[in-house]
């Protein structure tokens, strides 16, 4: 469904102020029946009481729950339904975002009696006379030869957790380890390696090999590590980002990808690429920060764990974080002077449509700018992560894999994050896309067109959503 969400560069030629971005509609998980147990849970860092908030009104109402009776009523209803679902089914049944996408696709597959094998990794592709004829799949303790009538689609989620390929393609992580991805840990580049063994080419020439996102590292209640992507908080009024030198370096309200590129450009050679989000008590309790929730939820656990740094003064906060105190105080003083008039002469925070959309519409005159003046003060460390990889298998316009000489490999297709992305220097907008292919080709979602003009499958595809990730070794249907 369309959103009023603006393009990331809405002011650029051809940019749109809203209405072009698409998101999945919420999906009732009860439609999956007993198979709901196979659907991965949302990332804990992106949930509220276990609820994955959908893009749009969900986030708006939850952010305004203490300021609006209408929002408070909406949140109360949403929470009541969620806890009732948990009591009855063991999990929430209002699926949003990636969960809704995976759930709808799975429901369509089950309705068509399409078998879906979980925990069944591909061992190798079957190649005969230069064409891919199928795959050897490990299932129930034995290898099974699966032959394909028309072709094999590789859609294994890219390589966000392939340390060797990260080392080669991520300039900010020369040893492959200084990078954190919230993506499934099973996405280790299996599809790319399978393609290479079959003669395919992985394009590693892109200026950005992934969709960069600033993340913070937290410890979950069960002791495991969590990776929190920072999408919304950076744009809020009363929140800025600084380097260890105590200076701002970018418009904090810009897209996650642009923000990380600024992080990389600002870093000195050989030093850790990290920055700190800074805010005061008023902003923290009004909007939250990273994994830290807004009022009325408690924040003590995050302070005790060290995830959230707190200081009674800016100099005390600087001492805890290693930020240069004098420079930080100067930066805040300069910000506060301009913020009283709703201006940001240094970086123009709030000057772009995307900034304003992610800010606070109830705050004026600039929805992204406010003084940082109410102690105590807080900081969270940000490092570099990704939302998915861009470098991938080189294909033609019909998703057919190409070899090193640009020739089609018969029977082999790539989709989603296994396919080389159509952009890499920057990200123009948040989108879902679908493609119609010739009768001889298969779409990224695995839908066959039996003859020219046969659009029945495409209509079903559009009605249920579209997917870009199906891992060869993940034990669940979907997660995010």
What are these regions (language model features)?
Residues 144-145, 149-151, 288-294, 387-454:
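C-terminal structured subdomain/cap of oxidoreductase catalytic cores
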Residues 124, 131, 327-422, 426:
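A glycine-rich dinucleotide-binding beta-alpha-beta segment and adjacent secondary-structure elements
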Residues 182, 228-233, 254, 382-392:
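Short Gly/Pro-enriched turn/cap motifs at secondary-structure boundaries
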């Amino acid at each position: 469904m369309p959103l009023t969400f603006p393009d990331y560069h809405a002011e650029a030629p051809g940019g749109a102020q809203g209405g072009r971005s698409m998101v999945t509609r919420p999906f009732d998980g009860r439609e999956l029946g007993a198979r709901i147990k196979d659907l991965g849970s949302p990332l804990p860092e992106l949930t509220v009481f276990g609820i994955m908030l959908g893009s749009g009104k969900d986030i708006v109402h939850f952010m305004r729950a203490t300021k609006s009776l209408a929002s408070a009523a909406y949140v109360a209803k949403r929470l009541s339904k969620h806890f009732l679902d948990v009591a009855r089914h063991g999990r929430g049944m209002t699926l949003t975002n990636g969960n809704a996408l995976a759930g709808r696709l799975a429901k369509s597959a089950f309705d068509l009696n399409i078998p879906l094998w979980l925990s069944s990794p591909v061992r190798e592709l079957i190649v005969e006379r230069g064409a891919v004829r199928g795959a050897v799949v490990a299932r129930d303790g034995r290898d099974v030869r699966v032959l394909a009538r028309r072709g094999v689609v590789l859609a294994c989620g890219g390589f966000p957790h392939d340390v060797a390929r990260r080392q080669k393609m991520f300039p900010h992580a020369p040893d492959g380890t200084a990078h954190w991805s919230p993506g499934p840990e099973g996405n280790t580049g299996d599809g790319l390696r399978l393609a290479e063994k079959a003669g395919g080419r992985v394009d590693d020439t892109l200026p950005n090999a992934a969709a960069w996102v600033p993340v913070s590292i937290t410890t979950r209640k069960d002791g495991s590590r969590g990776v929190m992507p920072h999408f919304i908080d950076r744009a809020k009024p009363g929140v800025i980002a600084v380097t260890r030198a105590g200076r701002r370096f970018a418009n904090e309200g810009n897209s996650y990808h642009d923000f990380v590129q600024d992080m990389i450009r600002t870093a000195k050679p050989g030093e850790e690429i990290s920055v700190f989000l800074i805010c005061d008590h008023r902003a923290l309790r009004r909007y939250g920060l990273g994994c830290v929730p807004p009022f009325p939820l408690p924040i003590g656990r995050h302070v005790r764990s060290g995830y959230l740094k707190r200081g009674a003064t800016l100099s005390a906060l600087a001492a805890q974080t290693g930020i240069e105190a004098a420079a930080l105080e100067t930066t805040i003083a300069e910000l506060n002077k301009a913020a009283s008039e709703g201006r940001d002469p240094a970086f123009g925070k709030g000057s772009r449509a995307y900034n304003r959309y992610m800010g606070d519409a109830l705050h004026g005159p600039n929805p992204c700018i406010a003084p940082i003046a109410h102690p105590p003060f807080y900081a969270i460390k940000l490092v570099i992560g990704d939302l998915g990889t861009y470098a991938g298998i080189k294909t033609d316009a019909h998703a057919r894999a190409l070899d090193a000489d640009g020739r089609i490999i018969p029977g082999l297709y790539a989709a989603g994050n296994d396919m080389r992305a159509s952009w890499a220097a920057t990200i123009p907008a948040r989108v879902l896309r679908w493609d119609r292919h010739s009768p001889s080709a298969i779409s990224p979602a695995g839908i066959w067109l039996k003859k020219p003009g046969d659009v029945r499958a495409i209509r079903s595809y559009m009605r249920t959503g579209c997917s870009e990730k199906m891992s060869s070794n993940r034990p669940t249907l979907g997660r995010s």
